[in-house]
Amino acid sequence: MVATGSLSSKNPASISELLDCGYHPESLLSDFDYWDYVVPEPNLNEVIFEESTCQNLVKMLENCLSKSKQTKLGCSKVLVPEKLTQRIAQDVLRLSSTEPCGLRGCVMHVNLEIENVCKKLDRIVCDSSVVPTFELTLVFKQENCSWTSFRDFFFSRGRFSSGFRRTLILSSGFRLVKKKLYSLIGTTVIEGS
């Protein structure tokens, strides 16, 4: 039985239409009871596991940014919008949920887009004991603030220049591209804002 919006349960003509088609009240009731057994209850252990996995992924992304700030970005601070890494981690988990090995089969390439140029920051292998089944390319975006470059101009001259290094501000936008390694079809692009 397929439920549609064209039949109204309060309309006597609809009920007689169902009876004329061979549906009897007992079979309708058993059809509804069927869904009670098919739709599973949410498993609390899975929810807790997913939360801890999400938090671990958030820490991996934050560590990547922390390592890259002095080595590859040449700055003393990276300011990340609130919940940005959390949103990215949730999208990564969602994209990995349909994969054969899940998140364990993921290799993530982390980049930063500065003035339309992508700079490679890191490569994260989620589980080195599993052959990768898909790649994710994460592109953080720099916030376009004119005041930061104006401030850097003033502090780059004079006595503050030796000790002061710029602060990089990330935008709340990002791009996440999924590429399946076992299939020619199936590139997925997510633009976060």
UniProtKB/Swiss-Prot annotation:
Record carries keyword Cytoplasm: yes
Induction and repression of expression: Up-regulated by oxidized LDL and hypoxia in macrophages.
Key words, A-Z: Cytoplasm
Domain of life: Eukaryota
InterPro entries named in the record: RTP801-like, RTP801-like_C_sf
Entries under Pfam families matching the protein: RTP801_C
Similarity field: Belongs to the DDIT4 family.
Function recorded in the entry: Inhibits cell growth by regulating the TOR signaling pathway upstream of the TSC1-TSC2 complex and downstream of AKT1.
UniProt cross-references to PANTHER family, sorted A to Z: DNA DAMAGE-INDUCIBLE TRANSCRIPT 4-LIKE PROTEIN, DNA-DAMAGE-INDUCIBLE TRANSCRIPT 4 PROTEIN DDIT4
Protein name according to UniProt: DNA damage-inducible transcript 4-like protein
Native species: Homo sapiens (Human)
Lineage: Eukaryota, Metazoa, Chordata, Craniata, Vertebrata
